[in-house]
Amino acid sequence: MKKIKKFLLTMAMTMALGTSAFASSGFEFLLNWSGGLKIGIPNKAAKDIGFKKGGGFDTAITAQIGYMFQVKDGFGISVLGELGYAFDYYNMETDTAINMGVSSMFNSFQLGLLPKFNIGFGGRHGLAIGIGGGVKIPISGNYTLNLKLNGTNPDGSALTQLDLKREDIISMYNPALIGYIKASIDYYLFFTDSIAMEFGLYLGGDFAPKQKDTKIGLDAFDIGLQLGFRFGPKA
């Protein structure tokens, strides 16, 4: 009888310790805004006709949804899906007497994966490092082509300006998608054990679509800030 009691006590303690060790695992949800600058990188077809690096910007409102697995006290791994709205503006120009500028803007549905490594510092503070990627599916946009002679535009207007719907984007670009990769580092300030404010920095890259007729394309390097709220357990 004593052996049975000892065995049951041992099992109870083991289960209690196991439950405690993984008590912080759980559902995770983040809602955030991000925004920053783009450095345009023309592809070979664009460089061959004189296009140089250009500027641009992006912004997005996304939700990250998934589960955090507690590996040990103070460290967890999150597996998160990412979806939301993204706005991207790309621009590039030639550096010649007859200056040609091309800009494009897209409103997109963003879909991707962003696994994160969560580090807890105790108390109200936490840190997360994320690496992931996905696709942006342009729903609408705008394409503009400008010509300037010695830095001036005689009539002050665009040579070509097109408002684009999804079907226009499909007929004009190949592929009609924007691939992206992203790395982020976020600081979490916890108000409770499961609610925190997020302050972050992201770096990324866009693999923008190429024009079907000319093969001209413009990729981009992105850098920016993100703010949001996190709902889920501490690491």
Where are these regions (language model features)?
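Cleavable N-terminal export/targeting peptides
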Residues: 1-26, 234-235
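Outer-membrane beta-barrel architecture
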Residues: 12, 62-66, 112-118, 182-186, ...
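Small side chains
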Residues: 18, 26, 36, 66, ...
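Residues at beta-strand starts and edge strands
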Residues: 25, 57-59, 77, 195-197, ...
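Predominantly the C-terminal beta-signal and adjacent terminal strand-loop region
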Residues: 29-31, 40-51, 84-88, 105, ...
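Gram-negative (and chloroplast) outer-membrane scaffold detector with strong preference
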Residues: 33, 57-154, 191
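N-terminal targeting signals for Sec/Tat export/insertion, comprising classic cleavable signal peptides
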Residues: 36-64
